[in-house]
């Protein structure tokens, strides 16, 4: 879902 995509994006940037 959208929320999952956003969380994944934030996690990637935080990586």
Curated annotation (Swiss-Prot):
Keywords: Amidation, Amphibian defense peptide, Antibiotic, Antimicrobial, Secreted. GO terms for cellular component: extracellular region. Signal peptide: none annotated. The modification Leucine amide is found at residue 15. It is found in: Secreted. It comes from the Eukaryota. GO terms for biological process: defense response to Gram-positive bacterium. This is Signiferin-2.2. It comes from Crinia signifera.
């Amino acid at each position: 879902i959208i929320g999952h995509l956003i969380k994944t994006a934030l996690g990637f940037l935080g990586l």
